[in-house]
Design a protein with these regions (language model features):
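Iron-sulfur-cluster electron-transfer modules
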Residues: 1-180
């Protein structure tokens, strides 16, 4: 369908929201205004097909930022995969997971894009939002970024902890269908 008709504005917005919020943080404020303004909600319904009566998820004022310095890999190391929803909308979940793992005696290494990634500051994404809206090439690109970041973690033999079940399952299911893994 996307190849024949193109990707709708609505699908571009929802599938690409993690990338858009990273590149244009002011969109978070716009979402808040839309949720509080009946006029903006009506415009959103007309332009994007999002029901005016529905509240959109509000991005956090400050997204999750992993620690600037990662600990040295040790015997009690664990890798934490912070999904884009937790990182951008509910960073307290990622911080709580990190705190629980620290309290359990683990050195927590937050998975990040590799240094040679085209956008090393942009958070990792499993690509499921793209895939769910038929944007297979974009999903494959996100999956490749995630696989590249996972490779050193897998090679270390340390456990990898994910927060969002659908992201973890995308590694097992979707990424294999995309020809990865």
């Amino acid at each position: 369908r996307n190849a024949a008709l193109g990707v709708s504005r609505r699908d571009q917005l929802f599938a690409g929201l993690p990338r858009l919020l990273h590149r244009r943080p002011w969109l978070g404020a716009l979402i808040g205004w839309r949720n509080r303004s009946p006029l903006l909600a009506q415009l959103g319904e007309r332009w994007l097909g999002v029901a005016a009566s529905r509240q959109l998820p509000q991005p956090a004022a400050r997204p999750y930022l992993p620690p600037a310095i990662a600990p040295v890999l040790g015997e009690r190391s664990v890798f934490l995969l912070v999904d884009t929803f937790a990182g951008l909308f509910q960073p307290h979940i990622a911080m709580a997971a990190q705190a629980v793992l620290h309290a359990a005696g683990y050195q927590v290494h937050v998975l990040r894009p590799l240094a040679d990634d085209a956008e090393p500051a942009r958070p990792l994404c499993c690509g499921r939002t793209y895939l769910s809206l038929g944007q297979v090439d974009a999903a494959r690109e996100e999956a490749r970024r995630l696989h590249a970041a996972l490779a050193p973690a897998l090679a270390s033999g340390a456990p990898i902890v994910g927060l969002e079940p659908s992201c973890i399952l995308s590694l097992r299911d979707d990424h294999l269908k995309l020809g990865l893994g």
